């Protein structure tokens, strides 16, 4: 059965085409900085927003009538959903996908039933991967939707909930390994608090760290070579989450000795909620040595919640890709579309329009970022700004050649009288705009 029979495979037709079901800028085989666009972007489609979400919101019921979401045997519907998903991936031409365990398999009425259902669906997903050539970018476990996780999973006051969560992650990590996944993501949607009046912060942080340590141990025990990634988010659904932003996650990992085992999966909309730019979070992840992967989407700056819209800003993404390219690009990570069509976008074509447009935006932004990397004008001005630190005096400070007192005495003896140099922000912004709009 075909779910998108009337929709052709999406092809590159160039910027002059007016075909809404064609790529206008994403030519997968086009080479930029020595790699194809496909190799740079490593695009993934998420299972949950695209094939699981029924179009509901907190004020209204599901608005979609997806044929794979109709009532029937739960496992059979899961197989139909997988058929629809892989038909979609294939027609879109995207190389990767991502899932939560309960996206792809019915949870059932017990942990044993969950495990059996998930095992059957992992077999089926393996068959679909083999037939299509589509690969798994990352898997994860849903530890936030079921009421048992209302007070958290790893941070729950009930150790039986911790144990259930451990079982889910064990199965999900095993499945990711078996399906050739390149990363495993841990998002602590309920790992936080709603009120401090009933919360023991130290205990919950210790529990969370113990849980992560067990995941790390299991990764090595089964021989999974992919990366473990935490996805930062400041709040929603909890008032405050322990993985607030990249810097918070890094501090947590260092505190518990996990900084060499776990990296971050950065979502653009989560950066917005944390009061940061997407550029900031990516740059910070590289500065702290924990960059892993990206969830490509956007939020609405006028809304205080996670809208998960498709990315549409070449300007924003150019700076994000500039950081990624200047640090060597993705290794195990990629650009996962954690994005959904709007509730009023009920036609099957809308799923394609959202992804096609966003993929074109990624391609445009990456090419503009490549211009910034190739012309080296931003980096040259940055190096010039800090050049004095590369001189003998600056290096002596950094290498421990001075104590605080001896440096103070040296400054007094030399009568230092430093002058402020321009930060040249306006010039730098002009360089970025020239690259984005093709002015130079």
UniProtKB/Swiss-Prot annotation:
Signal peptide range in chain numbering: none
Keywords of this entry: Carbohydrate metabolism, Cytoplasm, Isomerase, Magnesium, Metal-binding, Xylose metabolism
Binding positions for Mg(2+) 1 per the UniProt entry: 231, 267, 295, 338
Please list the GO terms describing molecular function.
Answer: magnesium ion binding; xylose isomerase activity
Q: Which GO terms describe its biological process?
A: D-xylose metabolic process
Instruction: Give Gene Ontology CC terms.
Output: cytoplasm
According to its UniProt record, the EC number is 5.3.1.5
Q: What is its main location?
A: cytoplasm
- Identify which residues the record assigns to the active site: 100, 103
Q: Which reaction does it catalyse?
A: alpha-D-xylose = alpha-D-xylulofuranose
On cofactor binding, the record's note says:
Binds 2 magnesium ions per subunit.
This protein's cofactor list reads: Mg(2+)
Give its localization: Cytoplasm
Q: Does the keyword Metal-binding apply?
A: yes
Assembly description: Homotetramer.
Per the similarity annotation, which family is this?
A: Belongs to the xylose isomerase family.
Protein name listed in UniProt: Xylose isomerase
Q: Which organism is it from?
A: Burkholderia ambifaria (strain MC40-6)
